């Protein structure tokens, strides 16, 4: 995709915010959404056990893909290997394999042949304490 990039001076941006307060609101709202995602990822690494962290990550990927019409509460295509999942989660590939088996045997999610299937979406979201509102893209930025 072609894009065009330009440098914007901070003073020019602040002037634009002063002239158009609604623009400032939109930019700050978008930044707060990004910050909420970063905070959620820090909680993942610092406070969640490997099983909950993996479940949360798979749910978040699904929610992000749903925003662009590529995922649902049924599941989604996921070409990531267990090695890539391990890197993203800060776990070993062997540990990810064990965790995925535990989640599958518990009847919550199956990760097989490049597809994540949510076998019991509601139970999985409860287990992972997943609340997708931190990624909310449906609420209008301006009313």
Task: List PLM regions with ranges.
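A generic structural signal for short hydrophobic patches within well-formed alpha-helices
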Residues: 13-14, 124
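Short, flexible helix/strand-to-coil boundary loops that buttress conserved ligand/catalytic motifs
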Residues: 9, 17-20, 128
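Polybasic "coupling" helices that flank or enter modular domains
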Residues: 18-90
